[in-house]
Amino acid sequence: MSNQTNKAQDNQVEEIVEGELLNENGTEATGEASLMDELTQANFRVEELEKALQEAETKVESQKDSVIRAAAEVDNIRRRSAIDVEKAHKFALEKFINELLPVLDNMERALQGTDAEAEATKAIYEGVELTAKSFVSTVEKFGLTQVDPLGDTFNPELHQAIGMQPSADFPANTVMMVMQKGYTLNDRLLRPAMVMVSQG
């Protein structure tokens, strides 16, 4: 009986040990599975965070680019505004001076039509001449320049040819007579000089 009792006890011990081993393996397996789940979740979370970080970095780069473009646009607007203001200052007198040019032309015609040597008209000539010189020097202070090209080579940017005549005194394509002087304001042509050009 002791053999049978021993065997029965041994079987019971084996069953208990196997049960415990199964429990331990199950717990171990459950612990490992739980650990694996946590690790998988952590890896998934890391991937999500890396993706969010990458999206945030892309957004930051995009916004940096937008800020740079906006700053460049502001600089361009400032530059254009400064140029516009400068042009406005430079050429604000253009319309006014254009209205004064006929007055100056009339003074020059009066000088051409008056005999400077005759006693009766000498005083008038000198008065008109002084007035014309004073007038020209005043408007020159504001950037007006006369274009008086007598003897110069014809320049279509500054001169308007009224006609061409043969001339032994002037080489070909030279201004031989100025019908009406031209004017520039701050290097911008207001009116071309009306000229007669030699054919040579």
UniProtKB/Swiss-Prot annotation:
Biological processes per GO annotation: protein folding
InterPro entries: GrpE, GrpE_coiled_coil, GrpE_head
Record Pfam families: GrpE
Assigned keywords, A-Z: Chaperone, Cytoplasm, Stress response
Principal localisation: cytoplasm
GO molecular function, one term: unfolded protein binding
Composition-biased stretches (Polar residues): 1-11
Positions of region (Disordered): 1-29
Protein's cellular compartments: Cytoplasm
GO CC aspect terms: cytosol
CDD domains, A to Z: GrpE
Function: Participates actively in the response to hyperosmotic and heat shock by preventing the aggregation of stress-denatured proteins, in association with DnaK and GrpE. It is the nucleotide exchange factor for DnaK and may function as a thermosensor. Unfolded proteins bind initially to DnaJ; upon interaction with the DnaJ-bound protein, DnaK hydrolyzes its bound ATP, resulting in the formation of a stable complex. GrpE releases ADP from DnaK; ATP binding to DnaK triggers the release of the substrate protein, thus completing the reaction cycle.
Subunit relationships: Homodimer.
HAMAP family membership: GrpE
NCBIfam families for this protein: PRK14139.1, PRK14140.1, PRK14150.1
Family statement drawn from the similarity comment of this UniProt entry: Belongs to the GrpE family.
Entry protein name: Protein GrpE
Organism: Shewanella halifaxensis (strain HAW-EB4)
Gene symbol of the encoding locus: grpE
